[in-house]
């Protein structure tokens, strides 16, 4: 039993609040345990120069932690005059994860900006950002679809993310900060509803791990990703019915 009372294969409570802010086409507050992230999706009727004239859209992400989202104050990137490596890595991960879910040709020449602001961090901020941002993305795309229906609905499948790790000798799902801090192995896994992998980021923090342990962690991640997708479906309700249909 973990310090929180959770079983090793149990995720933290998930709460997804849609339409959390007024102006963004999609906005979500996602809470996974004590980790809280505001995710917004904003639409621009243009694409980066390398996509002009291609007929394809683009999705890109920015990630930020509020200064007191952590136990001690974290300096804003803007005050350091550069984006730190961790922030850059995470926002690229979020962008890749969401682009994998979308038919860019069906989206057309539009850019969807995903902004993830961590309000409170207690482990799993990148995976929480991906899970919440997907819901914000669906809301933004649905608003486009209501204004002018797509010939083919562009979102192809659900995407969620979850962390897994080895703490002591136990393989556990959805690590909080206390667990992440002492984990021998720490892994972030992004998956589709069909059980396909989009990205696997794994590190042996305290030494190597075996292929058997890797397989066990991935099996655990698949269980967690399904639970996260169910939370997305519960939040979206009937607004998710177009996903994966490719219908006109």
From Swiss-Prot:
Residues where phosphate binds: 86, 124-126
Instruction: Please tell me whether the keyword tRNA processing is annotated for this protein.
Output: yes
Instruction: Quote the catalytic activity from the record.
Output: tRNA(n+1) + phosphate = tRNA(n) + a ribonucleoside 5'-diphosphate
Tell me a GO biological process for this protein.
Answer: rRNA processing
Against Gene3D superfamilies, the record matches this protein to: GHMP Kinase, N-terminal domain (3.30.230.70)
PROSITE patterns assigned to the protein according to its UniProt record, in alphabetical order: RIBONUCLEASE_PH (PS01277)
Q: What does this protein do?
A: Phosphorolytic 3'-5' exoribonuclease that plays an important role in tRNA 3'-end maturation. Removes nucleotide residues following the 3'-CCA terminus of tRNAs; can also add nucleotides to the ends of RNA molecules by using nucleoside diphosphates as substrates, but this may not be physiologically important. Probably plays a role in initiation of 16S rRNA degradation (leading to ribosome degradation) during starvation.
Looking up HAMAP family in the UniProt record yields: RNase_PH
Q: Which NCBIfam families match?
A: RNasePH
UniProt-recorded name of the protein: Ribonuclease PH
Organism for this UniProt entry: Clostridium perfringens (strain 13 / Type A)
